Curated annotation (Swiss-Prot):
This is Fibrinogen alpha chain. The lineage of its organism: Eukaryota, Metazoa, Chordata, Craniata, Vertebrata. Coiled coil: none annotated. Keywords: Adaptive immunity, Blood coagulation, Coiled coil, Disulfide bond, Hemostasis, Immunity, Innate immunity, Secreted. It comes from the Eukaryota. It comes from Oryctolagus cuniculus (Rabbit). Conversion of fibrinogen to fibrin is triggered by thrombin, which cleaves fibrinopeptides A and B from alpha and beta chains, and thus exposes the N-terminal polymerization sites responsible for the formation of the soft clot. The soft clot is converted into the hard clot by factor XIIIA which catalyzes the epsilon-(gamma-glutamyl)lysine cross-linking between gamma chains (stronger) and between alpha chains (weaker) of different monomers. Forms F13A-mediated cross-links between a glutamine and the epsilon-amino group of a lysine residue, forming fibronectin-fibrinogen heteropolymers.
């Protein structure tokens, strides 16, 4: 899992 994916899972799209 790259940083964008983990933020997507955690915050709902913030890292995308």
């Amino acid at each position: 899992v790259d940083p964008g994916e983990s933020t997507f899972i955690d915050e709902g799209a913030t890292g995308r």
